[in-house]
Amino acid sequence: MKKANPSGRCGSFGIPLRAVLGCLLLCGVGILCGCWDNAEINGRAFVLGFGVDAVDNPVSDGDDRYDFTFQLAVPVSGESDEAGAMEYMDCTVTQRSPAAAIRLLERNLGRQVNFEQLNLILFGEELSRQSFIGLTELFFRRASVRRQSSVAVCRGSARDFFAAGPDTHAIATDASVALQNYDGKGRSDGVTMNLHSLFKVLSNRDEFYLLRMAAVTPDDVENTVSTGLAAHDGEKPRMLAIVGAAAYGRSGGYRGELDGEEIEWLRLAVGRQTGGMMKTVDAKSGRTAFYQIQQSDCEVKCGVEKGIPWFTLHWQVRCLPSDIGDIFYGSGTSENPSASDTEQMLEETLTAQFTALTEKSQRELGASVLGLQDLTRQRMPDWYEANEEQWETLYARARVEIRVDCTLGGGGITR
């Protein structure tokens, strides 16, 4: 009869029996966990892009439903060579809320919808001119989604925008990267937003903000920022382009649109443009020059005359000649204007652009685009409180005087 092993060791190797059993248990748990992880992943659909449009086929005038488009990455399950890879697809459902749309999508797919990889929240052109901010509230509660998800509007419908991408990857990811790269580091002034920035704007009840507008266009359109979109038969190659921005007032009220050039002038007008470029065309020679903006400050005076507000805007701009373009200042000839002539040309250019921007603010964008509503509230609180309800009408009739002084540095560079 074999004697029991009082040491609790396994065989002649002296390994404790408990250690062997522990290793076997860990291996078993690892195998089970691995199988469970794969099963869990294969049971999910990852949302990369979330688009919202006004309902395409309303059943009545009061139809309060929306078309929700989900751009999905779906793990391929099974035992094929493609198992574990991602399949990309777009799914559109019509519901009254994002939560209801998600529930319907999960039933249709037989998978759990996951938003941890969400890159882009996109609103179609028609819906972007209505009240849509409430449709983002579901995502504000998700911290990881808030910080990584870009928010934008698009030309046409969000559904068609997502459908324009190739089958091999998600255009939502391309668009999110393009939106972030377009403005660049240090220029995040509310033009390109992620969901977190939008949440802060709405929480602070900011008077004015912008959302970038994207479009899929032929490759000969200016300001394209990303390539690689497949072309249909007989069509030109298409590109992802940033074509401007939609402007909104407090609580998401639509105010109008700004093209790319107007946005740059707006940056300069409100003192947010540093390191940017200004393009001018010499009236005499027709040549083009570019100047780098160093600093822009605006002194504002305001008052009321016969019940109508007035504003005096005095900009002081300092810039340097760039190595881009045809002309710099120099000898004072028609070919090489003097520094004073060039400064005058720049002042005329800036005055014309600031005047156009101010007139557009009075027609449609509102005073907040230039910060004039807050300024009036601060400097003339009693008058503003008494006239707040008719502020928009009064501002549209306001007298606005513009003055620009430009200082050109660079030591007389001539080319």
In which residue ranges do the predicted regions lie?
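Membrane-proximal alpha-helical signals and transmembrane carboxylates
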Residues: 11-22, 26, 30-415
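N-terminal secretory signal peptides that target proteins for export/translocation
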Residues: 1-14
